[in-house]
Each structure stands twice: as C-alpha cells, then as structure tokens.
Amino acid sequence: MSSSSETRRLRVGVDVGGTNTDGVVLDPSRASEPDRGIIAWHKAPTTTNPSLGINDAITTMFQSANIEPDHVASVTIGTTHFVNAVVERDVARLSKVAVLRLCGPFSKHIPPCIDWPEDMREIILGHYALLKGGLEVDGSLISDVDEGEIREQCAIIRDKGIRSVVINGVFSPIDTAERQEERAADIIRAAIPGCDVVCSKDVANLGFLERENAAILNASILLFARKTIRSFQEPIRKLGLHCPVFITQNDGTILSGDMAAKLPIRTFSSGPTNSMRGAAFLMQNQLDEDIMVVDIGGTTTDVGLLLANGFPRQQAAYSDLAGIRMNFSCPDIKSIGLGGGSIVRDGESMTVGPDSVGYKLTQEAVVFGGKTLTATDCTSLADQGVQIGNRKLVEGALSEEGIAKFKSIVKRKLEKVIDTMKTSPEDVPVLLVGGGAVIAPDELQGASKVLKPRWSGVANAIGAATARVSAVVDTVKSTEAKMTKELLDETSQEAIEKTIAAGASKESVKVVEMDTLPLTYIENKTRFIVRAAGDFDFSRTDLSTTLIEEAGAEAEQKMDEYEKSGKSNTTRRHNELVEDIDIEAYKPSVKNRVWYISETDLEWISIGCYILGTGGGGSPYSGTIRLREALRKGAVVRVVSPADVPDDAAVGCGGGAGSPTVGIEKLAGDEMLDAQRELYKVCPTPATHMIAIEIGGYNGLQSMIIGASSEMDLPVVDGDWMGRAYPTKWQTTPVVYAERAVIWAPVAVADGGGNVLVMPRASSDRQVERIVRAALAQMGSSVAVADAPVTGAECRRWAVEHTISQSWRIGRAVARARRDNRVDGVAETILAECGGAEAGRVLWKGKVVGVERTLRMGHVYGELVVEGADVVDHDDQQQQQQPEAVTSSSSSSGDRKPKFRGLLKIPFKNENLAAIRISRSKDADGKIVEKEEEVLGLVPDLVSVIDAQNGEAIGTPEYRYGLLVIVLGITASDRWTSERGIEIGGPKGFGMDHLTYKPLGKFVKPTSVIDEFDVSV
C-alpha cells in the first residue's frame, strides 16, 4: 500500500559503530523546532550480526513513537565497521590481497605497499607481481597484457589461498580503448572462480601508488563489507519498509547498497562524517565559527573541523588512513584508538587502547560483570557522577595514582589529536559527541569551550538521517566543435540532473567537484569528471527500494566468523606511537664538510624540492621512498659544497625530462642508470661528482639517487642548474652564461623500455632540446637524461648554490609549522627560509575554481584559476607586505585584515609561469570576457602553489577543483636576473612577450647546511 508524499516524510538514520548501534527517526520539516524534529532515538550495543542491532533499533523506535513503516521516506545506514578493521589491524576482517601490476619494466624499485606501516603490509599484502601491460600518457602501449603470464600468477595466488586480487595498470584511469585492467580481471575471474577482483581505475584517479593503496585496502575489506552490508539490509526487508536504503559515504552523501558493497572504501570515513553532519544539524543557527568535533565511540575517537558553513573541512590533495597514502578526497579526519571500550592495561607504563572490547562492552567491561578493564570502567571509578553499570564491581581495580594516570593519558591523547587538527595556535570550541564522550574531561587544553549538546550521543545517526545525495558524471566528449569550458558546463548540468534523479531536491544541488583530463591519443577528446550534491527531496516517492542480492539463505549472513580475532598486534609500529623528532634540536650529520643524508634530511629536502618546483618537476614522492629504502638498506648519500669541488673535477648530471603528469603515474625503472651507462660509452671523462639538473620536483632528488653508494657512489654538489624547475634544457644557468657554444652534448636519453638515444654532438643547446623533445613524444613523454660532465671550476661559476640546503630549510619550516599548528602561517614561515620579506611574499590565498590542461610534445600546458578568500594574517608587518591591488581594508576603524578578492590566473607550461589577477564580465553577446588586472608574479621568479591544509606543494598534475591553496612568490636567483637570464628564463622564453618582468624582491643566497653544521675532525 503506497502512501502520499505528505505521509511518507520521516527519515531513519542508523549508525552501526564498532561498539554501539545508534538510531534516530526525524521529521525534516520540523528541523528548526527546539527538538530538531527528532521523534525517536535509540542506542544499544552493536551485535556480531549487525542486522539484529539494526532491527532492534528501528523496532524500538517505531514502537516508542507509534511509527508506521509507510511513514518512512528513507533509511540511511552509516558504519565504522570497515575503518575500525583497518585502524585495529584486525586480521579476521582484513583479507590477504594479491597485487598484479600491469607496468612492464616500470615501478620495479617501488613495490606495492613499500610506504605502508610495516604491520599493515604484513597483514594485507599476500603476493605481488610486476607484469606486462600499461599505457603511455598518449594511450599507446607500454606493452599489451600477456594472458599466459596472468594465468601463471593466478596459479600462485590460488596456491596461496588468496581470494582478493588488485589489478593496477599504468595510466589505467585514461584507458578507454585497451581496457587492460578489465581484460586482466576477466582472465583472473576465469582462473580463480569466486575471487574478488578490484580494478584500480574504479577506486581512484591518476596517481599510481596512491590509487594502488586505495584499491588494496578496498580489496582487503571487500568480503567483510559485502556480508556486512547484506546484514544491514536484511532487517529493512523483514520490517516491511518499502523505501530506499542507502549507505553513507566519506563526503556525507549517500551511496546505494550495491555500490557500497563493491567500493566499501568510499564509506571508510562515513562514521565521523555522519557525526560532523549530525553536529552541524544540532548546532544549526548557532554555528558562526569553526568548531572541532570530537566523536568518541567505543573503539576510536575521530576528530574533524566543522566549518562555519556546516561542512567538514576536506583533506589535502592526498589523504591518509592508518599511515597509508591515498588520493581521493574525503573529510579531514584524524582517528586514534581511544574509546569507551578501549582496553586499559595497568602497570609501570599504563596503556589505554588502541585495542578495544568493542561491542562486547556490556559483557566484558568490569562494571558489567566482565573481566577486562576498559576506559568506561576507569571513568566510572574516577567520577562517581557517571552512572554506568555497577560501580562497585570496579572498585579497587586502580589505585588513586592509577586513576590519575588514566585521566592524564586520556586527556593527553585527546589534546594531542585536537592540537594536530588545528591550523592555528588559537583555542577553538570543541564539540563532544558519541557514546564514549563520557570518558572525556570537561576541560581540554586548546579548547576555548567544551560543548555537549542534547542528542550528542546519537549525532552520528542524525548525520546519517540527514545525509545528502550526490552523483558523478564521468564521460569522454569531443572538443572539436565546442570549447572545453562549454563542455564542462554541459557535463556539470548532466551531473546536477543525475543528482536530482538520484533523489536530491532541485534547488539544493550544487557542483562540488570537477576535473578534465585531455585524452591526446584520441584526437580532440577530453575526459570530464563532475560530481554534484544536494539535499534529499522528502517529497519523492519514485525512488528504487531494491536491496542488493536478496538471495534468500545467502542473505542470512553468519557474522560470527568476524568476532574480534584478538590477533591484532598491539606492539605494532603505529603512527601515533612513533616519537616526533625534536625539530629544534635536530642537527644534520656534517663531518669534514661532507653532509651525510639521513631519513629526516630526505623528508625535509623532498618537501622543499616540490615547493621550489613551482608546480612542475613531478612529485618527489616516489623518488623519496625509493631513496629512503636505499638508506634503510645501508646506502650512503654524500653532499658537498660547491666551494669544495676541485677545479678539475668532472661534475656529471642526470634527471628526468617530460611531463610531470607522467611522473605520478609511470614510476621509474632503470632508465636513469641506463642513460648514465650509455653516456660514458661516448664520453671519455667519467664523473667524479653529481649535480641536479633542477632542484624543483622529482629531479631535485635524482643526483642523490644516482650518487648513492648503492648506485654510482659519487658525492653530490649542493646546488643545481636552475634554482627551481623549468620545462626545457636550454633554460639552465650554464646556457645563460654561454661560456661554451654547446653545453648539453654529449647527451644520452633512455626511456626504461629498452630505447636509448645518444647524441655525441649538437649544433646548439636549443637543438639538443628540440631533438630530445621530438624523441620524447615517441618515448612515453618521460625519459631519463644523462648529461656530459662540466669542470669543477665551471660548476662553481654556473650553479645556483646551496639549493639542497634551501630545500632542507623549507621542508624543516613546513615541519615546524605543522608541529606548532601554524599551518595558517606556513607561507610566511617558508618565505623566512628564502630570505624573508625582502625576498618574496604571499601572492594569493583562496580556492581552486578552474583547471584546464592540454598536452603538446611532452609539455602540459594549461591554467589554474583561484578564487580569492578572506585571509587573516596574524603578523601586522606581513599585512603591510600584501600587494595593494590584492588587499582591501575594512571600513571599520582599526580593522586591517587583508582580503583576497576576485580571481587569480596561473598559466603553466609544466611549471607555473605567472600569477595574474583577472576580472571577468559578460559582453553584449553574453560571452565571458577576461581582463588582466595586475601581474603579481612572473618568471623567472618562482610562483608556487601550496596546500593550505598542510603546507606542501601542489603540482600541476594535482590541481583540482575545490582545493584550498596559498600562492607564494619567491625572488629568482641572481643567476637569472641578468639581461640574458631574463631573456631565456623570463616571459619571453615562454612566448609571453606582452608581459614585462619586475622582480618580486631582492634575492637572498640560501644558507649552506654544510657551513652551519660542519664538525671537522
């Protein structure tokens, strides 16, 4: 029997946590009333079979408020089951995974899970193999998949008893023609019937390692997720509810059950997201500032920043879960193993968590007659006002000293995680929600006030009930007859319509994410990805009520096999157990003017390299973990000052050339050493030292990789030929000095796939570039280049000095800003390491609202558009340094907060070329007309875009809609500011003859780490 839309108005939200199952029924039409329209709520321990808890919650609420099933418009279920399995490292719920890479000869130095915490790698990674396959960036084949090779691996996987397989192909997200991952999946399913196969392209986008990581986690949780979601849906059918059933996903929107069963990773952050959305619902009309939401459950505490607009703060370009780096957007949530069910171990060194009794709290906690001392027991013992269970049962379990120690540990854990999530040192309001909030103290350092609103214990269920609707359009369109922007607008409208069709109200839908990926191997074709979101339309009665795989007995899932295994390793190497390095006390190892690189040095240098890369040069991340592994295996990397290089030294050079987009997707093989070996077959003088071609990006580390004792074993010069990153070989300081007719010949080029190009001589450096670039287009748009050595005397005259030191100092500045929770001032901290106010300034702060890219002859061309956002700088002096055209003063007396308003355009050719403030208006025909208002920064000065959430650089391949960014301008080295230097590396070198270079400030030479820290013996 159907009901009218007026009758069917109620929304049911259920959140199945690791400890409690919470439910709420609310009437959204009464949301503004004092009771927020909450008709009924329920909290009960989570059962091993979640269907029993869901059934109990809904039945109890329906009975208490006399609710009929036909009154319900939707049921939305959220869960922390999956993320808890990962956080707890529960081997009973995490399946072993086999990883098959379709990569040909590439990525061999960076195997799967190399950057994972050691314990997670041991639990999940069961097998991996590097197989034929993969695409180049232009869609051509690295190699085709080999069915026989895949079948051989299937036999090994089958013998190991592994039932989950991940396929990760190079450039698979743009593979619309070869369908390599899909073809491999078909072969695997035929060879291993009944196994789960995850194609990486279905999980995340470009970014080989990060996509692979996400796919592996997704595969590991797949079996458990499928059975769990079926168990969620079963009680809905039994209760006679004929309404849509949704699962909440990471961004606070809803997902159909069948999609959630295939991509459970999209729900990993749904629990804390629900709590934050629920908090926003409870605090509506009271939220006029950012609030830190602390959701304390039975197993974990999840902390996130709820912005004044009611939405959670999003993570940076890369996300992190349990120490695993991924590349899909989700709320910026920090989870720690602390909850009401956390196990307390008393002793000389008391521990609280991270393991938990979870949903068995009412059976195993001492206050309920159990034998396991939990955080709830200790809280009951410490506070007589807490009425939970039988307090007498826990008396004597801890001494007064033990109680004080417990309270101190809990307080310290909460304060630390709150501190970590802050971006400024100012106190922020803290909102406590969740069933475990009872263990939290009433006061916390760093909190301006601690709030606990009514119904906060079921905020997660409220968030589920009020979850939004979203939809994605991912399509390829022809750009032959229409401009990219016009097609993007069309795709956005399609996404809006799809979101409305999925159940959103028309007036609430907005585009929340968009991306364009030119498919240059298909002429005039571009891939458009647009996501829109909106509020649920309660008047809809036409939405599907189908549940996934209603397979009778199979749907009656036995969940007993997922009882807490007890095998999670509490002595594991876990991020929260690792002591932070004392940044101020740390001193690099410099002995007799030789700097021996450590892991800490490498991390800081890597951060600095990417910032100096001005958007290009490729991400140093893969090079960082490759070199880190070499250091851990005993390799030695030596850095020396240019001043200490003998006149007759032979300073060699090597690095990558090509598109930075390729660098994050096609990981290196042996091409760098191949090129060096081929060079010295035609070059009579062997290198005695190495120097980086460019400090910016991936190439900033290449001299250290090549020079490591495990490779060529050569000292590395603290400098480079650019002081940044540039897209061409002739845009280097040796060419600026022009002391030789040709610098860059002989030269050797290798693509890692067996192809080598050697030029013993050339007519000019520009000709070297043209020939290498022409070959590059046929060699995968990314190659390794080995350059003939120069003399030590030439090196001292030409090199931009101390740029490894500069990178190290920039990285240290970012690390310090994070430690001090001054990420809001990280830009100024970076500038201080680059010479201070006279050497650079903050050009812009805001949100990315537009990205356009195209690929031509191995270069990525495009532009980034950033919409200005109001910015508060705490340093009055820094306020005075902002360009007048960018800032404006408030009319109120004494209010001098700078404002970034309007639009900033950053054109790029691999690297950012300029920062230009623009205005847009419509002409008489309604077409948008763009006007350049002011050039704020221009090559050869550095224009760097950094992530406002963590202070790290964002490269041109990572630009995407919605990112919050800071744009830095840093004055170029004086090696570039001569007339010839500006001609080569300035606007004219990029065809921007209409622009005139005006230096941002005065160049300040970087301070040498070797000079500062040397200990001579």
PLM regions with names:
Residues 673-684:
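Helix-rich "cap/lid" substructures immediately adjacent to catalytic or cofactor-binding pockets
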Residues 836-876, 883-1017:
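ATP/nucleoside-binding phosphotransfer catalytic cores, i.e., glycine-rich phosphate-binding loops
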Residues 271, 521-523, 690, 955-960:
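Short, surface-exposed loop and linker segments with low hydrophobicity and enrichment for Pro/Ser/Thr
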Residues 713-716:
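Conserved nucleotide-sugar donor-interacting segment of glycosyltransferase catalytic cores
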